[in-house]
C-alpha cells in the first residue's frame, strides 16, 4: 500500500485550507497513493477560539468536501481532524472515507491536550472540546487500520487495544508544538510502533513560525521494528511511503510480544466497540 501524508500549511482562511487540501490529495493520487492522511486541525488555526468558530456538524460543508474529494480521486482518505459540533459539544474529530465517498469510521480524540509545561507550552483543549468515548479501527483491502489523534499517542493502553483488535497500521493526525515536538515526537511514534509491532504514521501541519500555535511538523512513518521509515522536515511536504503489511506478521513471528503477554498476571480490560 502506498501511503501519503499531507504536511500542508494551515491558515485562518477556511477557503484557502479547503483548496490546499484538495491540491495535496490530488498530488498524492497522481503519485499513486492508496491511502491519504491529512493533519490534525487542518482546516483552522490551532486555538480554542478557532475550534468554536470553525466547528461544523457531521454532514456540514467541510464533511461534504472531504466525502466528495475521496470519491473524486478514488482514494481512502483519513481526513486529519476538524472541529465537529454535536449539540452543545465540540469534538476534535477524524472522519475516514473510502474511495466511493462512504464514511467508514469516525474517531473523536479520546485524550484532550491539557498541559502546562514549566517554561514551555500551556494549552487546555478541555476549555472548548469534549473527549471521545471510543477507540477506532476500519478495514481496507490492504489491512486493518487504527486511528488516534495527537495526544492519544501518549497513552500506550489505547494503542495496545488497537493492536489486539488487529491494527497493522495506526494513523495519527497530530500537531505537536515546539516544546513537546523536539522532546517526544519521534520517541513516542517509534515506541508505539515497537510496543505493538505495527506501522505508525503521524501527519502534522507544516510549521508556520508566525502562527499563534507553532506546529513541530516532521510527519513520519515508523515500521514494526521501531525504525523511522520516512520523515518530513518542517516545510510543507507530501510524504509518500510504501507500507508492506507482511512486515507486521514477520516481526511478530520473530519476537512474539503480543502472544507472550502474561495475562494470568495482568490484563488490559476494555469494552469492545461494535
Language-model region placement:
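Extreme N-terminal starter segment of soluble prokaryotic enzymes
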Residues: 1-4
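Short, acidic/polar
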Residues: 16-26, 154-160
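A short C-terminal boundary segment appended to hydrolase-like catalytic domains
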Residues: 246-274
Amino acid at each position: 500500500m502506498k501511503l501519503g501524508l499531507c504536511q500542508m500549511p494551515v491558515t485562518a482562511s477556511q477557503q484557502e485550507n479547503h483548496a490546499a487540501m484538495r491540491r495535496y490529495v490530488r498530488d498524492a493520487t497522481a503519485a499513486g497513493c492508496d491511502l491519504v492522511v491529512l493533519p490534525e486541525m487542518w482546516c483552522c488555526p490551532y486555538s480554542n477560539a478557532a475550534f468554536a468558530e470553525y466547528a461544523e456538524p457531521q454532514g456540514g460543508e467541510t464533511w461534504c468536501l472531504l466525502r466528495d474529494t475521496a470519491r473524486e480521486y478514488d482514494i481512502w482518505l483519513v481526513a486529519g481532524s476538524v472541529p465537529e459540533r454535536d449539540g452543545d459539544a465540540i469534538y476534535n474529530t477524524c472522519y475516514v472515507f473510502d474511495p466511493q465517498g462512504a464514511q467508514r469510521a469516525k474517531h473523536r480524540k479520546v485524550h484532550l491536550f491539557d498541559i502546562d509545561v514549566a517554561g514551555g507550552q500551556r494549552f487546555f483543549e478541555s476549555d472548548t472540546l469534549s473527549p471521545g468515548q471510543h477507540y477506532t479501527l476500519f478495514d481496507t483491502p490492504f489491512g486493518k487500520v487504527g486511528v488516534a489523534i495527537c495526544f492519544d499517542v501518549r497513552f500506550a493502553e489505547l494503542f495496545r487495544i488497537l493492536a489486539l483488535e488487529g491494527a497493522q497500521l495506526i494513523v495519527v493526525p497530530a500537531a505537536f508544538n515546539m516544546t513537546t515536538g523536539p522532546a517526544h515526537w519521534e520517541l513516542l511514534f517509534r515506541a508505539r510502533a515497537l510496543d505493538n509491532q505495527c506501522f505508525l504514521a503521524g501527519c502534522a501541519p507544516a510549521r508556520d513560525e508566525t502562527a499563534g500555535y507553532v506546529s513541530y511538523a516532521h510527519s513520519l512513518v515508523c515500521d514494526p521494528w521501531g525504525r523511522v521509515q520516512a520523515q518530513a522536515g518542517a516545510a510543507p511536504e507530501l510524504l509518500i511511503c510504501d507500507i508492506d503489511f507482511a512486515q507486521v506478521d514477520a516481526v511478530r513471528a520473530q519476537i512474539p510480544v503480543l502472544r507472550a503477554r502474561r495475562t494470568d498476571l495482568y490484563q488490559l480490560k476494555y469494552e469492545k466497540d461494535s
